[in-house]
Amino acid sequence: MKFAEHLSAHITPEWRKQYIQYEAFKDMLYSAQDQAPSVEVTDEDTVKRYFAKFEEKFFQTCEKELAKINTFYSEKLAEAQRRFATLQNELQSSLDVQKESSGVTTLRQRRKPVFHLSHEERVQHRNIKDLKLAFSEFYLSLILLQNYQNLNFTGFRKILKKHDKILETSRGADWRVIHVEVAPFYTCKKINQLISETEAVVTNELEDGDRQKAMKRLRVPPLGAAQPAPAWTTFRVGLFCGIFIVLNITLVFAAVFKLETDRTVWPLIRIYRGGFLLIEFLFLLGINTYGWRQAGVNHVLIFELNPRNNLSHQHLFEIAGFLGILWCLSLLACFFAPISIIPIYVYPLALYGFMVFFLINPTKTFYYKSRFWLLKLLFRVFTAPFHKVGFADFWLADQLNSLSVILMDLEYMICFYSFELKWDESKGLLPNDPQEPEFCHKYSYGVRAIVQCIPAWLRFIQCLRRYRDTRRAFPHLVNAGKYSTTFFTVTFAALYSTHEEQNHSDTVVFFYLWVFFCIISSCYTLIWDLKMDWGLFDKNAGENTFLREEIVYPQKAYYYCAIIEDVILRFAWTIQISITATFKPHVGNIIATVFAPLEVFRRFVWNFFRLENEHLNNCGEFRAVRDISVAPLNADDQTLLEQMMDQEDGVRNRQKNRSWKYNQSISLRRPRLASQSKARDTKVLIEDTDDEANT
């Protein structure tokens, strides 16, 4: 692998601009070589003057790059030293509290089960657990910084060697010895010391001297491109997807030849439609994950996943393929139910029962940690007013807004099984009389409207919670207003349908109100998508017309196509309303069934650019690992952090807002731990690029 490819594969994406610009240096060298005057045409002195002038410019650029790297390394090292001192303080506090409460000197001498502990002991146990996670993330940040150090030194060595080879000189090697090999980012070995001290603290204080267990906890995933999935996972993905395609073809033939024309299929379609949308969502999320990783968008950090253990795109494809097979088999079983001894109504219950069991399965199998993470996230989403809202929380709630059809179909399934299903018929899910009125359509319309509003309500109260935490009307209250338009749209749609069924004279009034609020909602959400969620139409976009100053994905056409797609699908309701008002209700149901997968696709496209925008915000803050602390932030710090996160133009301005940090000096007392021989004071000067600390 060429070094340029190696560098691109192993850099920390959030620090991309802080690495040596290796490709730019290569272009300079090759351009100088191509444009150099020929000795055959001009005299030798002219050629020498040309290369002397080029070398002066080249080494000036090298000096700027070296200064940039030194400054950034010094800042991140100072940040790491402060963080280490803070973690030691928190650890020492936990040790002191435990010694006072139990009289023991280590964390592992007390082995009572968690559910037998007192409230104070439970809090202490949770603090220790948080400390282990915090040290694990801190260790990862140290490895990233060490990797930054090594890659930049190797980059200088490679490009200066290439300089000497092209120009047939040794001045590049001399410059490296004089400048690079004495540069603070290379000579400072404090990062190695911090790594050793962190390993010692985790081993002696948190893992009771078990170094093997400590290093397993601190294990860092490969710092490079996505590692190839295990062979069996790849095999299962191919197998499941192949079977799923074959079963879908079989379903089409079965539907044509097995379904009777005198039976209505809408109950069956509405019961199985939600399962298909969920499978589509999982498959497209796998494509999202693959695309993020290829483009360098750090979704693991954005969602605050465990970098040592998370699902790859291959795993998501595998789950989607497996559930897709079950969905096809269940639907095929319904088609062939007359020749089976099992009643038709059992198959949907078995399918969705298995899906629920797969999610809540308490055994540590089938991606236990990922399923547990999702369950915790769902709990946080549905209890939004009582928790601080993070990115993953409102991202999942946004996904639910595009999957509201699943909730509506679930409500319909419960109603159908409760009131419409004829349990004594073998074809209970395929009623005989297509003209027979649908009891659930009338009985549960108010309930269906409430269910349809649930996802928007979740995002609405999340916005109110964020306003409560930050006291910033923009963007949180404005965003809440966006989701409130859904309530009006659904309400007037329900009133229109109800009054139309009863032939009320005021039906047309509710129809126009419904259309009016649909227009308001679509315009509101479209503007928010493009401007706030995606960060497009930036006035400082420069050559990226109508986009933003910095883009991650390689082709501008992706962005323009996404804008057009979002506009079309945000206003696709106009087709559905027109057809529903003109033709029979079942025609409207057909359109709704077609548009539901398209809305999932729209959210799939939205995900790419929403996470890109968040990734660029992290780049603006040079944030590469999760921020985990046992000690809670005070109100002022929390408000400041929220304001930085929500700043619309944060990618550019956050670096300006950081300037207040550079002239501070911070003195922190490191407490004495068993893994250290004596207490030390560490004074960190952030503006000092030689990284020497007074100890």
From Swiss-Prot:
Phosphate binds at D398, N401, K482, Y483, R570, R602, R603. The chain crosses the membrane at residues 229-259, 265-296, 310-337, 344-365, 389-422, 430-471, 473-503, 507-534, 554-584, 587-625. It catalyses: phosphate(in) = phosphate(out). Residues 671-695 are annotated as: Disordered. Pfam families: EXS, SPX. The keyword Cytoplasm does not apply. Keywords: Cell membrane, Host cell receptor for virus entry, Membrane, Phosphoprotein, Receptor, Transmembrane, Transmembrane helix. Residues 366-383 dip into the membrane without crossing it. The keyword Membrane applies. GO terms for biological process: intracellular phosphate ion homeostasis; phosphate ion transmembrane transport; response to virus. InterPro entries: EXS_C (IPR004342), SPX_dom (IPR004331). Its main location: membrane. Residues 1-228, 297-309, 384-388, 472, 535-553, 626-695 are cytoplasmic. It is a multi-pass membrane protein. Residues 2-224 form the SPX domain. Residues 260-264, 338-343, 423-429, 504-506, 585-586 are extracellular. Expressed in pancreatic islets. Residues 158-165 are annotated as: Important for inositol polyphosphate binding. The modification Phosphoserine is found at S667. The modification Phosphothreonine is found at T689. GO terms for molecular function: efflux transmembrane transporter activity; inositol hexakisphosphate binding; phosphate transmembrane transporter activity; virus receptor activity. Homodimer. Inorganic ion transporter that mediates phosphate ion export across plasma membrane. Plays a major role in phosphate homeostasis, preventing intracellular phosphate accumulation and possible calcium phosphate precipitation, ultimately preserving calcium signaling. Binds inositol hexakisphosphate (Ins6P) and similar inositol polyphosphates, such as 5-diphospho-inositol pentakisphosphate (5-InsP7), which are important intracellular signaling molecules involved in regulation of phosphate flux. Belongs to the SYG1 (TC 2.A.94) family. The SPX domain plays a role in the regulation of phosphate flux. Inositol hexakisphosphate (Ins6P) is bound between two SPX domains of the homodimer. The SPX domain has high affinity for inositol polyphosphates and its affinity for inorganic phosphate is two to three orders of magnitude lower. This is Solute carrier family 53 member 1. It comes from Mus musculus.
